[in-house]
Every structure is written in C-alpha cells, then in structure tokens.
Amino acid sequence: MAGGFRPYDQDSCPNLTNSEAPEFSMSVVCKTEPHYFHPQTAILPSVQYSHPYHHYLSQFAPNFVPYYYRLLSRPIMKQEEMDIENYINYEVAAQQTMMRQRTLKPLGQLQIQMPPPIIVNQPVKPVPVKAVPVRRSSPPKRRVINAQLVAVATASGGIKNIEPRVEPLPRLEESFKQQVAKIQKSQHHYEQLFGRLTSMLKTLNQRYDNDAEDVPAPPSKRPRHMSTSSSESHIPDTASEKDEKDTLVQYPHRVQKEDGSAVYVLGPNGTQITAHQYGEVFWTNAPVATRCLLCVVFSSDELATHTLTGKPSPAFYGRERPPKLQLDQRKVDDIVVCVRNRTGGKERVIRATITTKCADTAKKYKRRAKKAQKVAIKEEY
C-alpha cells in the first residue's frame, strides 16, 4: 500500500497524470518526493501516486473508515527505534539473577582474590637452574640391638640349636650362707642406726635455724637414797651453788691491758680473745654465737680433726674409723658459759652446735682434698 497518510490537497496535486477528467484510472505514475518530507509522518519513504489514497479507498471500500479518523488528533508515526524500556528491564533482570546466585552460593570473605593476569608483550626468558649433583653414598649400616641367635637352619633343612652352654653353678657352702646372714643382720642394724641419726641431725638443723621449738629436757633420773650416818648429807649445798652462779655471771669480762689494748675473758678458765674478735661475734642466738666463738678460739684444722667428746661415732658401728682427738674442754666450758650469759641459750643446744660445727669442718676438708686430687689427675693427662 501507499506510505504515510496525506490529506488531499488540490494545491499540491492540481493535475492528474493520464487523464484530464477526475475519473477512475488504473494508471499510476510514481512522482518524486516533495521537498516538505516529514519523518514523523511516514515509516517508509513516502511515494506520490497519480490519485490520492482516499480516492482509491472510496472506490474499493466505500464503507471503510480508518481508526484514526475517529481520534481527535492524528497518531504520530515513528520509525523503528531502540526500545529503552525493554533494555532497562533486561539489565534489571540480569542484576537480579546475579544477586540471586550470590545469595544461594555466597563467596567466602577470606577468599583470596587473585590479581588479573599480567599481559607481557615480551616473552619470558626461562631462568637457568644449576643442576646439583646427587651424592650417592652407601646405605647406613644396620644396627642390631639385643639380638640373640636361637637356631640356624642346616643345609638339609633341619634346625640346629645354638643355645650357649652354661656351666652349672657350684653348690653354696654353709660358711658362705652364714656370712650372708651376718651381713644382712648388720645391714638391718645400720638401717635402724642411720634412721635415728638422720632424725637427730634434722632436729639439730631445725634448732640451729630456729624453725622448731625447744624440745623439753629429758626427765631427770630418780634420786638414789644412800644410807649414811651423817645427817648433813641430805641437806643440799645451796650456798656453794649460789656462789658458783654469781661467779659465772660476770663473764664475758673485759680486761684492759697495760699497753692500752683490751681483751675479753670468756669464762673462769681464762680463755681470752681480743676486743676486735669479740666485736665480730653475732649474738643473735646461741647456735650462731657458738659457731663464731669456735672459729675464733680454735683453728679450722683443730675443728676438722677434733670432736667434742673424742669418742668414735656410733654411725660407723662395725666399720669403726680411727677416733678423733678431743677438743680442749677448758676452752669448751668457757665458750658454753659465755654464750649462756649473753644469749640465754641452753647448754645442750650449745654442745650440739659444737658437734655439728666439727663435722661440717671435716666435710669441708674432704671436699677440698677430692677437688685437689681431680685437678692433679687432669694435669697429668
């Protein structure tokens, strides 16, 4: 059919082509496009025919009325263009699909995002790798630990027993059994003795460190009633004991010499030390003061080779060692008197401290001797 609708205009087409009279004619001659072409009124390029479109329409369809005749204004005809609404709807649908996929399969937050590949125009040169020669050493030797060969198969397939032949032990003699019994008996005795000594040393150490309370004194022995004819024997000598106590209270006593130096007399036996030595003694408690006075009055050699009583130690019963010498009892008594008057300690605590000090000094000398022997052996090698 013809292109866009144009109202009939007598001015635009005054003459008909093949006939002068306005009658029906089938000859149609296409004319050129006029200069007033409007793109909104035609989809295709408009073509001017010899007769108007409505003239032919009235001839073939006299009762046909186009729908746009009923409108107030004629419709605007546009050429085919891009549908913006469909394009927007397509983009929205694509975004919704992508969000739905992410919701169903969320990406991990800690997923490592790899950077985009770097496009290198130049070819990558391979880095030369130096070949490292592999050292083929001999396999490690097998170590066999605690292996015992029990049997070996012979050439014929039999099993040969190779258990070592152990000679039977000789019969035990009766004298040997008696010696073993004696050793067991003495060992039991030593265990009991060492147990007592360990507890005693522990108690002495606690007393020396003032960690334990004073143990009550052992009960006094029952008085022995001796029958005598003199009635004076039953009267205690209170006067002599009181005079002795008064005499001992004055110690330690400071004495000024003619040359101007001062000395201290520790007890009634006349044991003396200088004022400087007396000032270096710590009088905090009885054990500490006793050890300080022992180091001043006696030398280290005397303390290592002497004991308080000079008797062999019961700890070495059955294997007695040579007994040590006894310390000078006069000096020991002066030390006991001095410490008792200054600290108020008990005599048995002071004497126990003297025994411990002698043992400690002897151990110190033994350790020094062993150390010197080791050094001498190293020098020889």
UniProtKB/Swiss-Prot annotation:
Role this protein plays = The heterotrimeric Elba complex is required for chromatin domain boundary function during early embryogenesis. It binds to a 8-bp sequence 5'-CCAATAAG-3' in the Fab-7 insulator or boundary element in the bithorax complex and contributes to its insulator or boundary activity. Elba2 can act as a transcriptional repressor and binds the palindromic sequence 5'-CCAATTGG-3' to mediate transcriptional repression.
Print the keywords alphabetically: DNA-binding, Nucleus, Repressor, Transcription, Transcription regulation
In which organism is this protein found?
Drosophila melanogaster
Which InterPro entries does the entry link to? Answer: BEN_domain, BEND6-like
Which GO CC annotations does the UniProt entry carry? chromatin silencing complex; nucleus; polytene chromosome band
Q: Does the keyword Transcription apply?
A: yes
* Pfam families reported in the protein's UniProt record: BEN (PF10523)
Q: Where in the cell is it found?
A: Nucleus
Which gene name does the record give? Elba2
Q: Which GO terms describe its biological process?
A: chromatin organization; heterochromatin boundary formation; negative regulation of DNA-templated transcription; negative regulation of Notch signaling pathway; positive regulation of neuron differentiation
Q: What is this protein called?
A: Early boundary activity protein 2
Could you tell me which residues belong to the region Disordered? 210-245
Which stretches make up the BEN domain? 268-365
PROSITE patterns attached to this UniProt entry: BEN (PS51457)
Comment block on domains? The BEN domain mediates DNA-binding.
Q: How does it assemble?
A: The heterotrimeric Elba complex consists of Elba1, Elba2 and Elba3.
Which Gene Ontology terms cover its molecular function?
Answer: chromatin binding; sequence-specific DNA binding; transcription corepressor activity
Which domain of life does the UniProt lineage start with?
Answer: Eukaryota
